[in-house]
Amino acid sequence: MLDSKLIKKICDFIYVKPRSIQEIAMHIQKNWRTADSYVDKIIKEQGNLSVRTFREGSRGALKIVYWNNVEKIHSNDFQERLFKKIEIAKDKKDFSPFDIYQYVDANKRRAFLEQQSEYTITAKQDLISAMRQTEKQLLIFSGNLSWVNAVQDKKKIIDIFEELANRNISIKVLCQVNLESIKNIEKLLELNHKLHKNNIEIRHCEQPFRAFAVDNTFVRFKESRNIESSSHHETKTYIFYEISDEEWIEWIQKVFWNLFRTSISAENRIKDIESIEKIK
């Protein structure tokens, strides 16, 4: 059973130097498959380990696990300056995703502009297909988690979350946990109870991004341009930035884990909010 003591034993072993799954298996006296599943669980839950597979697809494939230093966020001056801005940003108005986008190789990025109402996902965005590409982990930066109420072509996004969670995809969310967002948060966390699984974890954090990262495949940011139409249903203009550069994806993941590990769980914060008289 993977408990905190065994997690520490594995992490301490890998911290010294990169290890193969076979070495880890011998160290903890488990078989290769069990060691591999333990490493995968630690990666999903804590983000402090990473894996590289050499000669993938061949009989001689070698899986190496190494320490992912989430403290060392930046690998260049651009990233260092950006992270300093992110650390002090509390709202989406405080930081533009374009400040990241501009540094990414033109062949590994794309952006498009669309007008939409808050809860309607367009075919061009195709959020459903994007989410379904997830094989292991979906990391989400959100504000009030309003997109759990969104719909794409009559298909509810909350149903896609359920689909992913049922496939044992790890879903980690950073969002503001307050009176305005509690219903959205509880709606998403309810899937854990419904499925009798704990694949969804939400933590409170005030941060500037509205984005999600699909495994190591791509990151998509959403930025509001605050342009409204005169129609009854409020329509805004948004810019979507998509990044597929491996180095920048890894950096954004490290930003996520740096914020996530120091943030309080949504469940605990909701309990504290509800402890205030007359709020329940």
Residue positions per predicted region:
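Hydrophobic residues on short alpha-helical segments
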Residues: I7-I14
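Short amphipathic alpha-helical interaction segments
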Residues: K30-K41
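HKD-type phospholipase D/PLD-like phosphodiesterase module
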Residues: L174-D215
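Short, cationic-aromatic polyanion-contact patches
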Residues: M1-L6, S20, V51-F78
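Short capping segments at the starts of secondary-structure elements
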Residues: I14-E23
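PLD-like (HKD) phosphodiesterase/transphosphatidyltransferase domain
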Residues: F83-V173
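Alpha-helical residues within the helix-turn-helix
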Residues: M26, K44
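HKD (HxKxxxxD) catalytic microenvironment of the phospholipase D
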Residues: I200-W248, F256
